[in-house]
Swiss-Prot record:
Residues holding ATP: R110, K151, S156, S157, G158, K159, G160, Q161, E191, E192, F193, L194, E199
Protein's name in the database: Formate-dependent phosphoribosylglycinamide formyltransferase
Protein's GO biological process: 'de novo' IMP biosynthetic process
Species the sequence originates in: Prochlorococcus marinus subsp. pastoris (strain CCMP1986 / NIES-2087 / MED4)
Alphabetized Gene3D superfamilies for the sequence: 3.40.50.20, ATP-grasp fold, A domain, ATP-grasp fold, B domain
């Protein structure tokens, strides 16, 4: 009989959105104490956490003071908008940052993760260039070629991303990128617009032993860089899956922190092209709440808590479709829920965000079926029935 005893830990969640909320659900199943932090009151994860605080996580001293005061066993970032300097200093003092402060820093900056993948590890990416001065914009753009994408060096959920087809639109895209940029860096990344066949997420669990475990690829679609729908399994050639796993292993061997990673790729013909990486549960991975025997949130916890991870298996073909607000509201409510839930094997998750904004993700539909096409159709139909009302 094993002498190992699991002792419940205190987890501090930095960022309390919908992904954090599901992480809290799984953490509470394991008897963990969870404290949630965000910049606004009543964020989704706060509604389930043992305690919560509203602070400016981008302020180094404020963040350091609060973390020291709470003295958690693990600090688990869920967002990019936080002081990396605070995390690095706290890690040096012995605080456990998940997966580690270096990884959080690299993945929150598009230039750092792109340089690591392309220049240091020689992993195939789209052509790219950095621009830190508006006077360089036209020259660098001509080197990449049109159409191209302009993105802030630091942002999330597709904010500030633009597809530019001609040089006359460069300045507008530049201004939009800077307006939606996080952090203090004034700069953008110009990226070749790939005419890809499809894109996917490879959820990868990095154990404390250094072993990598791969979930089945998740197909997804985005609009302006923001997730719209996802499905699992994805019908793709095994040789392409193997290539994506090889690339992922190279990156994670360099980053070397335990937890789950959402690694995004494009496929163009027989090419697999690295896109982005998040060191935490991924929005496209919400499909695993119904598609896998162990969902991505529980996998994240098991990985950094050094708990066993047995075989990960697919339960049934599954799909998601997000519920997007088309209006502003300080007291959002929802119509169409009855009709949405009439479809078989379909669930609706309302995130519980206290306010609605145009384009804001307010919920997600999860659907399963023996036929993946039917699962996707039902997720789409159900999501269309739900409307945000004031």
């Amino acid at each position: 009989m094993s002498s190992f005893k699991f002792i419940p830990k205190k987890i501090l969640l930095l960022g309390s959105g919908e992904l954090g909320k599901e992480l809290v659900v799984e953490a509470k199943r394991l008897g963990l104490e969870v404290i949630a932090i965000d910049k606004y009151e009543n964020a989704p994860a706060m509604q389930l956490a043992d305690n919560s605080f509203v602070i400016d996580m981008s302020d180094k001293e404020i963040l350091k003071k609060k973390i020291k005061e709470l003295n958690p066993d693990f600090v688990v970032p869920e967002i990019e908008a936080l002081s990396i300097e605070a995390l690095k200093e706290l890690e040096d003092e012995g605080i456990n940052i998940v997966p580690n402060a270096r990884t959080v820093e690299i993945t929150m900056n598009r230039d750092k993760i792109r340089d690591l993948a392309s220049k240091e590890l020689n992993i195939k990416t789209a052509k790219f260039s950095y621009v830190f001065n508006v006077d360089e914009l036209e020259i660098k753009s001509s080197e990449i070629g049109f159409p191209l994408l302009i993105k802030p060096l630091m942002s999330s959920s597709g904010k500030g991303q633009s597809l530019v087809n001609r040089k006359e639109d460069l300045l507008l895209a530049w201004n939009d990128a800077l307006k939606n940029s996080r952090g203090k860096i004034v700069g953008v990344i110009l990226e070749e617009f790939l005419n890809f066949d499809y894109e996917f997420t490879l959820l990868t669990i990095r154990k404390t032993s250094g072993e990598n475990i791969f979930c089945e690829p998740i197909g997804h679609e985005q609009y302006k860089g923001d997730y719209q729908c996802s499905w699992q399994p994805l019908d793709m050639n095994q040789s392409l899956i193997n290539e994506a796993r090889k690339m992922t292993t190279k990156i994670l061997n360099n980053l070397n922190g335990s937890g789950i990673y959402g690694v995004e790729f494009f496929v163009r013909g027989k090419e697999v092209i690295f896109s982005e990486l998040s060191p935490r549960p991924h929005d496209t991975g919400m499909v695993t709440l119904v598609s896998q025997n162990i969902n991505e949130f529980e996998l994240h916890l098991r990985a950094f808590l050094n708990l066993p991870i047995p075989n990960i298996s697919l339960l049934k073909p599954s799909a998601t479709r997000v519920i997007i607000s088309d209006k502003e509201s300080n007291t959002p409510s929802y119509s169409g829920l009855n009709e949405a839930l009439e479809l078989e094997n379909t669930k609706v998750l309302i995130f519980g965000k206290p306010t609605a904004k145009k384009g804001r993700r307010m919920g997600v539909v999860l659907s399963t079926d023996d036929d993946l096409n039917i699962a996707r159709e039902n997720a789409d139909k159900s999501a269309l029935k739900i409307k945000i009302v004031s």
